Every structure is written in structure tokens, then in C-alpha cells.
Amino acid sequence: MNRKGKVGLVSGYFNPIHKGHLKYIFSAKARCDVLIVIINNDIQVKVKGSKPFQDEKQRFDIVNQLKSVDYTFLSTDKDNSVANSLRHIHNKLLKNYNYDILFFNSGDRGSQTWNEKEKKVCEELSVECIYLDLPKEASSSNLIDKLIDSEKGKCDRCDKPKWILSV
């Protein structure tokens, strides 16, 4: 049976989005016809222990505007995986179509440390897991820490962003 095309799925917190995230999204899009980006929700940001920078709506809206992104989906999961979201997207959108479905990952989840829940769901749904071995470009946590340090005047090497005004 001939497949109609490839649908790619990626997920991320994008809290905040940076150059490394963009390369991850662009690299995934280059390997598929349609790209769906799953945005981890605010509950997941707390579960991860990250510092909230932008809420899920802001992150969703920003990612949704990227040219490489065909569809965005706000995660329905309550843990550190997107397993339920993958299942939902597959069952509601992709199950009845003849697509190869690819789930891409990169960054802090190495090819040997793939989330087990996600891996299991992908196996059940015949979704191919592909690790994109991309160089580490930036870290959202480091960007947030750098901003906090620059605000406190603790960072010599940090230039204050132009939009932060001192009175």
C-alpha cells in the first residue's frame, strides 16, 4: 500500500523559544510533508520544575506563527510526556488516513533516553520515533537565568535588553 505522505510530530515547552528550538522544528519539517507541533502545557512546566516565562497561550501563539509549522496542538498530558497527546492526535486526526507518522525528538532527550510512555504509545500506533542529533544551541533555563541576573545587576556579561527600562 502506497503512503500518501509523511506527517511529523514534535513537542516542546518553548519556554521561551530560542534558536535551538527553531533548528529542531526546521529539521523535523525538512523530513515530512506536514508538521504538527505539540506545545507542553502550563501544568507540565510546573511538573518539569521550570521557571514559567510565558504561559501556554503565548507559547502556542508564537509557535503557531512559524512558517514551518502546519498545525499546533496544546498538550493534554499532566506529566512529563506527550503520550496522551500523541494518542489523541493519532485517533482524532490521523488514524483514518494513509500517512507515515513520524515523532521527532532532540535536545535533552537523547536517543537512549527517550520517554518510555511516548515510546510505548508510538510502538502501539506504528509511529516511527526519530531522534534528531542537533548541536545544543541554547537553553531556555539559561536564558531565563541570564535575564533574571541582568535584572538584578549580577551579570557582567549580560547586556540589558533594550526593552527593559530603568527609572
Report each predicted region and the residues it spans.
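Nucleotidyltransferase catalytic core that binds NTPs
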Residues: M1-V167
